[in-house]
From Swiss-Prot:
Listed name of the protein: Agmatinase
Cofactor(s) essential for the protein: Mn(2+)
Residues the record lists as binding Mn(2+): H126, D149, H151, D153, D230, D232
Hydrolase as UniProt keyword: yes
Reaction(s) the record says it catalyses: agmatine + H2O = urea + putrescine
GO biological process entries: putrescine biosynthetic process from arginine, via agmatine; spermidine biosynthetic process
The keyword Hydrolase is annotated on this UniProt entry: yes
Pfam families from the UniProt entry: Arginase
Database matches in NCBIfam families: agmatinase, PRK02190.1
Organism expressing this protein natively: Citrobacter koseri (strain ATCC BAA-895 / CDC 4225-83 / SGSC4696)
Function comment: Catalyzes the formation of putrescine from agmatine.
Enzyme Commission number(s): 3.5.3.11
Length: 306
């Protein structure tokens, strides 16, 4: 298999074990998995501090501290008893070739989705979401986007590979519908005419969680949803290990409650991106990312018990 290597993980920046100590499966297409975790160690599209290629490894490493809890608080059940989740390791591509990464990731995602799997991906910088959206749109059609970030990433700078342009490109390619999409935690300059509903960090920090979730549900409706979480949505006090930190963000507590509140949406794909462990302190950024990823899986598992 050319995309993910052979029966061992030959990524230069990967772990030898899976997320939550889950089994590594380098042939996930023919497995009985419900959700497949894929690491995307890519940071060539970064405009700030590089190092996101080491994000997947950092998330997996710290996730071992989350694996022990079976009846996770406050869910009171074990996600692993309801979902079959496997980790297929990292996407392998020629470091330095952004186009190859994009094409291989899209092909990998298309193959998984065609086999009836769902994807949770770990970046890497946020550009990796664009090839994932392309694959998901081929399978599910135009989607709603629920996007946690400090930046809208809707900047039209003419650069093909840039972690600040994906959500300018995606609507133009018909991948997502901005009128049914929400960007949460924004606290940098953005174009107010791009069609997205923007819930900036000031209002997200001041409003009640239930009120925000009700608005998100109303905007998204019953559309298929792609959920993407850039870790710089969190305040640097909770996530210093990222490429473009911005003061004034969400607490980890608020972010977790918001993610839990998305359980009624028709989420078809998910990612957590922009962890750069070289700038982390005591692995708190990686831990936040791993915890948010785990909560994403729990909102999927909760539906299995309904």
């Amino acid at each position: 298999m050319s995309t993910l290597g052979h029966q061992y993980d030959n990524s230069l920046v990967s772990n030898a074990f899976g997320f939550l100590r889950l089994p590594l499966n380098f042939q996930p297409y023919d497995s009985d998995a419900d959700w497949v975790i894929t690491g995307v160690p890519f940071d060539m599209a970064t405009s700030g501090r590089a190092g996101g290629r080491h994000g997947p490894a950092a998330i997996r490493q710290v996730s071992t501290n989350l694996a022990w809890e079976h009846n996770r608080f406050p869910w009171n059940f074990d996600m692993r008893e309801r979902l079959n989740v496997v980790d297929c390791g990292d996407l392998v591509y020629a470091f330095g070739d952004a186009r190859e990464m994009s094409e291989k990731l899209q092909a990998h995602a298309e193959k998984l989705l065609s086999a009836g799997k769902r994807m949770l991906s770990f970046g890497g910088d946020h550009f990796v979401t664009l090839p994932l959206l392309r694959a998901h749109a081929k399978h599910f059609g135009k989607m709603a986007l629920v996007h946690f970030d400090a930046h809208t990433d809707t900047y039209a700078n003419g650069c093909e590979f840039d972690h600040g342009t994906m959500f300018y490109t995606a609507p133009k390619e018909g991948l997502i519908d901005p009128n049914h999409s929400v960007q949460i935690g924004i606290r940098t300059e953005f174009d107010k005419d791009n069609g997205f509903t923007v819930l900036d960090a000031c209002q997200v920090n001041d409003r009640g969680v239930d009120d925000i979730i009700a608005q998100v549900n109303q905007i998204v409706g019953d559309m298929p949803v792609y959920l993407t979480f850039d870790i710089d949505c969190l305040d640097p006090a909770f996530a210093p290990g990222t490429g473009t930190p911005v003061i004034g963000g969400l607490t980890s507590d608020r972010a977790i409650k918001l993610v839990r509140g998305l359980k009624d949406l028709n989420i078809v794909g998910m990612d957590v991106v922009e962890v750069a462990p070289a700038y982390d302190q005591s692995e708190i950024t990686a831990l936040a990312a791993a915890t948010l990823a785990l909560e994403m899986l729990y909102i999927q598992a909760a539906k299995k018990g309904e």
